């Protein structure tokens, strides 16, 4: 992942130092009033979370982040219910839940129909993944197969959707219990 979309310079995050990343202006692309805004550290972000509010942390790298993330979570004043991990990588979710079982973690997955018109991943694959990773639920795009959603939630898992920007989609997801 890079800083191309947000910053005044394009750096590859995983190949950059914190010092280099902190020098970037990540505000000007929105509006000049935000000029000079810097990338915060995770501890600074945690410190800005108000009581009774939550933060969803999307892990885009691999397992190597877990020890550092757990350390920063431990140093924060946030309660377990305030920090939720989301990730496509099943092994990251599993490792996070092994270390911090009291925190919620959701498996990120999109749904597509195959050539035969069947949803992928299948209901069995979703339920097996949630159980194997000890995830608390699923977080998906707005393209939600209703029957799979109902069965997953009936099995006791939560389901959330990302990037819903219109009222009709929001109401459809709400009607499903998402």
Locations of regions flagged by a protein language model:
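An active-site metal/cofactor-coordinating segment within enzyme catalytic domains
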Residues: 1-51, 103-120
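Conserved, mostly hydrophobic/aromatic
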Residues: 21, 45, 57, 89, ...
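Second-shell loop/turn segments in exported
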Residues: 31-35, 54-60, 82
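C-terminal active-site rim and adjoining tail of enzyme catalytic domains
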Residues: 32-36, 108-110, 115-178
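A structural motif corresponding to the C-terminal end of an alpha-helix
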Residues: 44-54, 76, 133
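Structural preference for beta-strand elements that scaffold enzyme active sites
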Residues: 54-56, 82-85, 102-106, 136-139, ...
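Active-site-adjacent beta->alpha loops and helix N-cap segments on the catalytic face
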Residues: 63-66, 90-95, 142-152
């Amino acid at each position: 992942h890079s800083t191309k979309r947000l910053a005044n310079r394009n750096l590859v995050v995983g190949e950059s130092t914190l010092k280099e990343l902190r020098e970037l202006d990540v505000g000007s692309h929105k509006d000049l009033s935000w000029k000079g805004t810097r990338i915060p550290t995770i501890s600074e972000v945690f410190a800005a979370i108000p009581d009774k509010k939550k933060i969803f942390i999307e892990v885009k790298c691999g397992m190597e982040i877990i020890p550092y993330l757990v350390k920063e979570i431990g140093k924060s004043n946030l309660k377990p219910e305030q920090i939720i991990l989301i990730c496509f990588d099943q092994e990251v979710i599993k490792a996070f839940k092994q270390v911090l079982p009291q925190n919620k973690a959701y498996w990120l997955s999109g749904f597509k129909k195959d050539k035969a018109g069947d949803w992928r991943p299948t209901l069995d694959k979703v339920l097996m993944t949630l159980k194997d990773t000890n995830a608390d639920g699923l977080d998906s795009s707005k393209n939600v197969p209703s029957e799979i959603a109902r069965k997953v939630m009936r099995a006791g898992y939560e389901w959330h959707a990302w990037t819903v920007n219109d009222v009709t989609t929001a109401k459809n997801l709400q009607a499903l219990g998402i």
